[in-house]
């Protein structure tokens, strides 16, 4: 639901302690909980309103304190409230809504920050590695840390716990799968760029296999053995192991020797009928990050004043043989749901962040739309299944802001024409040159399904680890 609505939030907080809801499979959710489209003409009395009736009973009936069989966690990397609003305004219009991101009935906000490695003091602007470590392990750490605390000690993550409890596990991203967010479920290294043996020897020597460590992110991933991992990052698999049983072999050859099935396009992905510990699945659909959905000009100094308004265009490099985030999400659910013990699946829309860094509004908007479509797939499964908790949030906030179209802003700006036909000016103003930076504002977190009420109110990023662990009843 939209971030400005206090109604559902206050109801959720007050009713989280009420008795059990109807049995999950028998529950019929009120459609008004999910449909947040403006109800009429925006210029008319009440036309912009998104809620027409009292939702108390509907929200009460949506609550369940049962344990979840499955959890689907969807992360919009860099998807702060500003990024959601930018994308909604452009792609859906002022009165529109995202049928996934905006449709989860229980909403809260969480704090996120990392720690300085030497002092342990708060670092109020986290990177994606420390933030992913926070929700995957329940431990705050330093920027750059993957699955380790400020003392470089590893902590068991949600995927490892889910496996230990007999659940199927999945990890989907539009980034390189060695990138920070997916990597936090796959490995424990002291620096986030230790994708393969080469970087690990230089940047994470204590983790390198030749030094007695557990290996690079990719090498640890192959040992961790999740059932389904889909995304980019094929280039690292060409590197060669320097030590251990597979010394001298490429990481791809090692994966094949360990029994993994590797697919590289949509048709090959569609052909997969099962993925489990006997034959886990790896989908590698790009050498690095996967191509973005939409293209447009990057913002420039006074671009909103000196350049014409633009509309975003489809990226010709995102060809039909490359699966979308929604397609990868659907396939992962299809394969994981066969486990009678349930599953844990993390899905990341990675390039909201990457395009925000590049001050490219069309890039980040398209990736937000992509994530919304993935959320819709997860939500549809959860509604039909009745035993699945869906959570949608972000790892950190970012730099894009909506400003008045005529403003002479000090940063980089670009003017877009929205679905409404109105001008939308986007500003990136926290870096003089080069990459725009993360910001430290609290983030929206929203949920649907068993124990969804635990995301309401103010929580911390580390609470997400405990919320999921409790919902799935994961034991050490």
Curated annotation (Swiss-Prot):
Sequence positions that bind Zn(2+) 2: 77, 395-396
Keyword Phosphoprotein: yes
Residues that bind Zn(2+) 1: 353, 357, 438
Domain of life the protein comes from: Bacteria
Family: Belongs to the alkaline phosphatase family.
PANTHER family according to UniProt: ALKALINE PHOSPHATASE
Name under which the protein is recorded: Alkaline phosphatase H
Species, as recorded: Pseudomonas aeruginosa (strain UCBPP-PA14)
